[in-house]
Each structure stands twice: as C-alpha cells, then as structure tokens.
Regions:
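C-terminal scaffold of the Radical SAM
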Residues: 2-8, 27-51, 55-213
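Local cysteine-cluster metal-coordination motifs and their immediate loop/turn environment
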Residues: 12-25
Length: 213
C-alpha cells in the first residue's frame, strides 16, 4: 500500500495597511472585514480538514497580504482551527509572515499559543530611503526590534526577506543590508530581485533601476 505524501497547507491572509509599490499579490485594506474573513476561513479549514482525513500535514504557511495585521487573537483562532482539523506531523513547520510594523509582544504571545514555530519577516532593506521608495510602512529600526523581540519570545526559527535591484540601490548598499540582516542571526535569508509587474504602482511608473553589474 502506497503511503500518501504529506500535505502542505497555505492560508492567504489578504489584509494590508497599504499596498507596497512593487506588490502584485491580492490584498485589501478594509479592516472592518477581518472578523467575517476569519470566520469564513475557519469554516473552510474545517471543510478541507474533513477532505484530508487519513493524510498528515507537515507544513503550514500563513502568507499574504500581511498576516500579522490580522492581529494575535484572530491568528490564534485560525492556528487552533488548523490543529483541530488537520493531522499535523510531529515536526510540522508552522510559519506566519509578519510585518515589523504590526509585530509586538501581544501578537508573538498569541502566535506561540497557537503553535506557530517559524516567523518570516519582510525586512527588504536596511536603508530607510530604499524602504520608502518601495512603499514599505516600517523602517529598519522597527524591523530589527521586531526580530529581536521574536527571539526574546522564544522563536528560534526566523526567516528574513531581502530585496535587491531597488531604485537608487548600489551594490555596496545591498551588501550593507545583507550584512545587517545576517547580524540578526536569522535561520534563513531569502534574497529577491525587484520585478516590475505592470499592475503595480512601480510597474506603472517604471523607475530607473540599477544595471545588472
């Protein structure tokens, strides 16, 4: 008898304070819809949990959007629903994407109670002028403090996202951002090149980007 492969569960949390200038993922800013969304998502979790009976799940990923903007109480409800309706493997990795601006002690405590064991922070750059150019709502000091706070709250598995090819960015600036992110001792670091999508703010404006050299 062939044993079914473990499942990977992705939950999209579409809410953002504002849309970043480069982002083409689906997102909304209407926070008044958060409670209704959470209730609907939990109903879907129960439905799909029934359909997955007999299979284990070894990865759970809450992406967005900005999952942390949903708030600790709602995220804790969602994470508990996942645990109650899916057969999680003993070492299941449960990741929640966090924006530094919406990360605080209350959120981190709720994520711990919900069973999250990995956080992913969209740092993107260590220079505030670069962050402003791409429409990020946080500065690097806020990002640094959020990562340190996560460590203090017991999260040892932390991933950071960093971008290169930003408008006005030099190679030295990127390398400095890389060094400052590595100094935060993440478990994982992802580097992404800026891609101008046509339906985004930056795609419509077509800023001058660094050359490939």
């Amino acid at each position: 008898m062939i044993t079914p492969r473990p499942l990977g569960l992705y939950l999209h949390i579409p809410f953002c304070v504002k849309k970043c200038a480069y982002c083409d993922f689906y997102s909304i800013t209407d926070a008044s819809r958060m409670d209704a969304f959470t209730d609907a998502l939990i109903r879907s979790i129960r439905e799909y949990g029934e359909k997955s009976a007999g299979r284990t799940t070894d990865t759970v990923y809450l992406g967005g959007g900005t999952p942390s903007y949903l708030g600790g109480a709602r995220l804790e409800r969602i994470l508990h629903a996942v645990r109650e309706n899916f057969a999680l493997a003993e070492n299941t990795e449960i990741t929640v994407e966090c924006n530094p601006e919406s990360t605080d002690a209350v959120l981190l405590d709720a994520l711990r109670r919900g069973g999250a064991n990995r956080l992913s922070f969209g740092v993107q750059a260590a220079h505030d002028n670069e962050l402003r150019r791409i429409g990020r709502i946080h500065d690097f000091a806020k990002a640094k403090n959020a990562v340190l706070l996560a460590h203090e709250h017991g999260f040892s598995n932390i991933s950071l996202d960093l971008m290169y090819g930003l408008p006005g960015q030099t190679q030295d600036m990127f390398l400095d951002s890389l060094a400052q992110c590595l100094a935060l001792q993440p478990t994982h670091l992802s580097c992404y090149g800026l891609k101008l999508e046509p339906m985004t703010e930056m795609g419509r404006e077509a800023p001058v980007l660094p050359d490939n050299d």
